[in-house]
Amino acid sequence: MVNMKASMFLTSAGLVLLFVVCYASESEEKEFPKEMLSSIFAVDNDFKQEERDCAGHMRECKEKLCCSGYVCSSRWKWCVLPAPWRR
């Protein structure tokens, strides 16, 4: 009975150790692609999205007009999709 408990404990400890080692090596491997992708897709100031003259979906429409395909909700003052019940 004692040998079975000891073997179960050693098996559990071995699995935990294996998990920790695999996790550590995997986290090191994950850092490299992240760094590479961030350097490839670095965003310049020239490529940043310019602010629109219209408000998109679920944006406030108090000062800006809604973009085409959206209407300003009279209740919440958000740009929403037009629907038959919103007339």
UniProtKB/Swiss-Prot annotation:
Pfam families: Toxin_12. Ion channel inhibitor. It is found in: Secreted. It comes from Cyriopagopus hainanus (Chinese bird spider). Disulfide bonds join C54-C67, C61-C72, C66-C79. This is U3-theraphotoxin-Hhn1f. Residues 25-52 form a propeptide. Keywords: Disulfide bond, Ion channel impairing toxin, Knottin, Secreted, Signal, Toxin. The keyword Repressor does not apply. One of its GO terms (molecular function) is ion channel inhibitor activity. The presence of a 'disulfide through disulfide knot' structurally defines this protein as a knottin. It comes from the Eukaryota. PROSITE patterns: HWTX_1. Residues 1-24 form the signal peptide. The keyword Disulfide bond applies. GO terms for cellular component: extracellular region. Expressed by the venom gland. Belongs to the neurotoxin 10 (Hwtx-1) family. 51 (Hntx-8) subfamily. Hntx-8 sub-subfamily.
